[in-house]
Amino acid sequence: MGADASLPMEMCSNFDAYELRRLTRRFKKLDVDGSGSLSVEEFMSLPELQQNPLVQRVIDIFDEDGNGEVDFREFIQGISQFSVKGDKNTKLKFAFRIYDMDRDGFISNGELFQVLKMMVGNNLKDSQLQQIVDKTILFHDKDGDGKISFQEFCDVVEHTEVHKKMVLENI
């Protein structure tokens, strides 16, 4: 990648030229088959994601074009959200998108159930998990439409400082 190729990436990410060069090398190392994009298996070799039960959701969000793989641009833009320079709103939007599986701008009862199921596995019975989901929606759905909007989500996590935990230190 020449200087021309990295300039737009600097403008649409939170990384400077040096960080982009490092990330380019890391991407190429992860791209074992040399295809120019990361498969789920290649992506899973990132130590930061190996123990994360939501790794498939992270990959789905990074994969903006929905082709099942993460190309370099998607990788940089995705990782950029976890930069220490990333802003709170961007991090909250990413966290919201983990739950908003169909990308309609809302977290439905079913979506919340699916994501929580990924996190708790079989530690709770489905009926117990459904009760938690129902109560969560009921309590935080301020406009009564049966789903959680981005603003309602932000109201819930506002005081948790979750955005400060959404940082990869050694990218």
UniProtKB/Swiss-Prot annotation:
Q: Which PROSITE patterns match?
A: EF_HAND_1 (PS00018), EF_HAND_2 (PS50222)
Give positions of region: tax-6/calcineurin A binding.
131-136
Quaternary structure note: Forms a complex composed of a calmodulin-dependent catalytic subunit tax-6 (also known as calcineurin A) and a regulatory Ca(2+)-binding subunit cnb-1 (also known as calcineurin B) which confers calcium sensitivity.
Listed SUPFAM superfamilies? EF-hand
Compartment list: Cytoplasm
Tissue specificity statement from the Swiss-Prot or TrEMBL entry: Expressed in sperm, spermatids, spermatheca, male gonads, intestine, nerve cord, hypodermal seam cells, cuticle and excretory canal.
Q: Spell out the family assignment given in the record's similarity comment.
A: Belongs to the calcineurin regulatory subunit family.
**Described function:** Regulatory subunit of tax-6/calcineurin A, a calcium-dependent, calmodulin-stimulated protein phosphatase. Confers calcium sensitivity. Plays a role in egg-laying, fertility, growth, movement and cuticle development. Plays a role in sensitivity to CO2 levels. Regulates expression of tax-6 inhibitor rcn-1. Negatively regulates nicotinic acetylcholine receptor (nAChR) sensitivity to nicotine. Negatively regulates lifespan. Involved in endocytic processes including coelomocyte endocytosis, intestine apical endocytosis and synaptic vesicle recycling. May negatively regulate autophagy.
Protein's UniProt name: Protein phosphatase 2B regulatory subunit cnb-1
Q: What happens when the gene is disrupted?
A: Mutants grow slowly and show uncoordinated or lethargic movements. Increased lifespan. Body is small and slender with a transparent appearance resulting from a thinner cuticle. Reduced number of progeny associated with a retention of late stage embryos in the uterus, a reduced sperm count which appears smaller and smoother and with smaller pseudopods. In addition, serotonin-induced egg laying is delayed. Increased susceptibility to nicotine-mediated paralysis. Impaired CO2 avoidance. Increased number of puncta positive for autophagy marker LGG-1.
Residue numbers for the site described as Interaction with PxVP motif in substrates of catalytic subunit?
118, 122
Q: List, alphabetically, the GO terms of the cellular component aspect.
A: calcineurin complex; endoplasmic reticulum; sarcomere; striated muscle dense body
Residues that, per the record, bind Ca(2+) 3: 100, 102, 104, 111
The EF-hand domain covers: 18-46, 50-85, 87-122, 128-163
Q: Where along the chain is Ca(2+) 4 bound?
A: 141, 143, 145, 147, 152
Q: Which residues bind Ca(2+) 2?
A: 63, 65, 67, 69, 74
UniProt keyword annotation of Metal-binding present: yes
One of the protein's GO biological processes: calcineurin-mediated signaling
In terms of domain of life, where is this protein from?
Eukaryota
Coiled-coil zones: none
Q: Where does Ca(2+) 1 bind?
A: 31, 33, 35, 37, 42
Keywords, A to Z, come to: Calcium, Cytoplasm, Endocytosis, Metal-binding, Repeat
Q: Which Pfam families does the entry link to?
A: EF-hand_7 (PF13499)
Q: Which GO terms describe its molecular function?
A: calcium ion binding; calcium-dependent protein serine/threonine phosphatase regulator activity; phosphatase binding
Lineage in the entry? Eukaryota, Metazoa, Ecdysozoa, Nematoda, Chromadorea
